[in-house]
Amino acid sequence: MESRVLSRTTAIAALPKLFRPSREAASFGFATGVKTPVGLVKDGGSLTWGRQLRPVLLLEPVQTGPVCSRREKTAVQPCRAASGSSGEAKTGFLEKYPALVTGSFFFMWYFLNVIFNILNKKIYNYFPYPYFVSVIHLFVGVVYCLASWSVGLPKRAPMDSKLLKLLIPVAVCHAIGHVTSNVSFAAVAVSFTHTIKALEPFFNAAASQFVLGQSIPITLWLSLAPVVIGVSMASLTELSFNWLGFISAMISNVSFTYRSLYSKKAMTDMDSTNIYAYISIIALFVCLPPAIIVEGPQLMKHGFNDAIAKVGLTKFISDLFWVGMFYHLYNQLATNTLERVAPLTHAVGNVLKRVFVIGFSIIAFGNKISTQTAIGTSIAIAGVALYSLIKAKMEEEKRQMKST
């Protein structure tokens, strides 16, 4: 009898002990802060209170707060991994292919620029007032920015005195480059202006080395030589050549070079969309006084009346509005592209854009060009292509050295 009692006692002692959790833990499945004897877990584990009869091993040690059991943890992990992989599939495409995004920026930049240049030159054919048209370009862009800010697309970034000091020289360079470019567009053929402005990589390289102190390899300098030679050949035999158009295009090269360099510095504090919006506002105030002084009297006397008499009031206003919209949008995309690439790469892309503009402008306006001008333009474009290949190869070598 005694042995039978002892055997029952031993059998009962060998069974796993049951722990009734608190009501809060039982209802939500959360572990409490009560310490569980490690020996009980080792012997067979604790049983979750209720209908579940199989032992569930608790984590060792048990933490306070919501902690899942090992059984629950192993059951949840695959779902969590699947969810994560699904999220990566949805959001990781653009991150996996950044070159595709940058390429789309370049394409839209080129497309809008071609439309702008064709419409802009058509306006100058019946309304030759580049200072006033430059103001209209910026004014339409500023109205667009204010309307976008009012609906939160994008959200307006606050302006402080430090950033304002950075943006003022950028806006001044932008205003000077914009006005001088339009003076050149009004004076000579669009194709010739863009041929002169193909020298922008040369000015960017010079500014990067002598202003920013960056070392430019001799091979890059040599690759820019065909660009200079080609532009010189094209200039000597350009049928629409005049010094006003040539000098204005050269001044715009210098101005836009400094704009690119200082814009890159300013982007550390604000996104490119808001930066260009503030630049447009400041540049508008910079361009307005010269337009009033230089062209104001002529516009009031006969400029507006002549344009309305030639094309009508509706078309005149419509042309000014759309040329301003295309100008703002293509410059906004150019600024967004600059945010993704280095200034020199941006300059090269700018020159390749001119290939499209030159080609489409010749087709649209039927401009006659001499054989030497065509050869010079081709040499300049080939020089830019050579420069791009050398620059890309150097950047790839730098990335490989950093990875090793």
From Swiss-Prot:
<feature type="topological domain" description="Chloroplast intermembrane">
    <location>
        <begin position="295"/>
        <end position="372"/>
    </location>
</feature>
<keyword id="KW-1133">Transmembrane helix</keyword>
<dbReference type="Pfam" id="PF03151">
    <property type="entry name" value="TPT"/>
</dbReference>
<comment type="function">
    <text>Mediates the export of fixed carbons from the chloroplasts into the cytosol in the form of triose phosphates.</text>
</comment>
<keyword id="KW-0934">Plastid</keyword>
<keyword id="KW-0813">Transport</keyword>
<keyword id="KW-0812">Transmembrane</keyword>
<comment type="similarity">
    <text>Belongs to the TPT transporter family. TPT (TC 2.A.7.9) subfamily.</text>
</comment>
<dbReference type="GO" id="GO:0015605">
    <property type="term" value="F:organophosphate ester transmembrane transporter activity"/>
</dbReference>
<dbReference type="GO" id="GO:0031969">
    <property type="term" value="C:chloroplast membrane"/>
</dbReference>
<feature type="transmembrane region" description="Helical">
    <location>
        <begin position="210"/>
        <end position="230"/>
    </location>
</feature>
<feature type="topological domain" description="Chloroplast intermembrane">
    <location>
        <begin position="153"/>
        <end position="209"/>
    </location>
</feature>
<dbReference type="GO" id="GO:0015297">
    <property type="term" value="F:antiporter activity"/>
</dbReference>
<feature type="topological domain" description="Lumenal">
    <location>
        <begin position="394"/>
        <end position="404"/>
    </location>
</feature>
<feature type="topological domain" description="Chloroplast intermembrane">
    <location>
        <begin position="75"/>
        <end position="98"/>
    </location>
</feature>
<dbReference type="InterPro" id="IPR004696">
    <property type="entry name" value="Tpt_PEP_transl"/>
</dbReference>
<feature type="transmembrane region" description="Helical">
    <location>
        <begin position="132"/>
        <end position="152"/>
    </location>
</feature>
<keyword id="KW-0472">Membrane</keyword>
<feature type="topological domain" description="Lumenal">
    <location>
        <begin position="120"/>
        <end position="131"/>
    </location>
</feature>
<dbReference type="GO" id="GO:0055085">
    <property type="term" value="P:transmembrane transport"/>
</dbReference>
<dbReference type="InterPro" id="IPR004853">
    <property type="entry name" value="Sugar_P_trans_dom"/>
</dbReference>
<protein>
    <recommendedName>
        <fullName>Triose phosphate/phosphate translocator, chloroplastic</fullName>
    </recommendedName>
</protein>
<feature type="transmembrane region" description="Helical">
    <location>
        <begin position="99"/>
        <end position="119"/>
    </location>
</feature>
<dbReference type="GO" id="GO:0015120">
    <property type="term" value="F:phosphoglycerate transmembrane transporter activity"/>
</dbReference>
<keyword id="KW-0809">Transit peptide</keyword>
<keyword id="KW-0150">Chloroplast</keyword>
<dbReference type="GO" id="GO:0005794">
    <property type="term" value="C:Golgi apparatus"/>
</dbReference>
<feature type="topological domain" description="Lumenal">
    <location>
        <begin position="231"/>
        <end position="274"/>
    </location>
</feature>
<dbReference type="InterPro" id="IPR050186">
    <property type="entry name" value="TPT_transporter"/>
</dbReference>
<feature type="transmembrane region" description="Helical">
    <location>
        <begin position="275"/>
        <end position="294"/>
    </location>
</feature>
<feature type="transmembrane region" description="Helical">
    <location>
        <begin position="373"/>
        <end position="393"/>
    </location>
</feature>
<feature type="transit peptide" description="Chloroplast">
    <location>
        <begin position="1"/>
        <end position="74"/>
    </location>
</feature>
